[in-house]
Amino acid sequence: MKIRPLHDRVIVKRMEEERKTASGIVIPDTAAEKPDQGEIVAVGAGKKDDQGKLISLDVKVGDRVLFGKYAGQTVKVEGEELLVMREEDIMGVVEQ
């Protein structure tokens, strides 16, 4: 199954966080915080302005982005957890 986001929405795959502290203590899943970074795997066509003109998104597939801890809606596709969120929920793009 494949998801195609509509309008100004994007599909984001969360980045895996390190499950071990610097001193070697393993953090259990129940105590670990959700990662606030992810990679964009799909983008919508864009948002229409008041005149009906399509405004394209500033992010693209493959961008590594920062977002709020509780941003977006979690969906499960083929056993993989993905986030569906609006472009405005993205705080920035991580430059590499």
From Swiss-Prot:
This is Co-chaperonin GroES. Keywords: Chaperone, Cytoplasm. The gene is groES. Together with the chaperonin GroEL, plays an essential role in assisting protein folding. The GroEL-GroES system forms a nano-cage that allows encapsulation of the non-native substrate proteins and provides a physical environment optimized to promote and accelerate protein folding. GroES binds to the apical surface of the GroEL ring, thereby capping the opening of the GroEL channel. The lineage of its organism: Bacteria, Pseudomonadati, Pseudomonadota, Betaproteobacteria, Nitrosomonadales. Heptamer of 7 subunits arranged in a ring. Interacts with the chaperonin GroEL. GO terms for cellular component: cytoplasm. It comes from Thiobacillus denitrificans (strain ATCC 25259 / T1). GO terms for biological process: chaperone cofactor-dependent protein refolding. GO terms for molecular function: ATP binding; metal ion binding; protein folding chaperone; protein-folding chaperone binding; unfolded protein binding. InterPro entries: Chaperonin_GroES, Chaperonin_GroES_sf, Chaprnonin_Cpn10_CS, GroES-like_sf. The keyword Chaperone applies. It holds the Pfam family Cpn10.
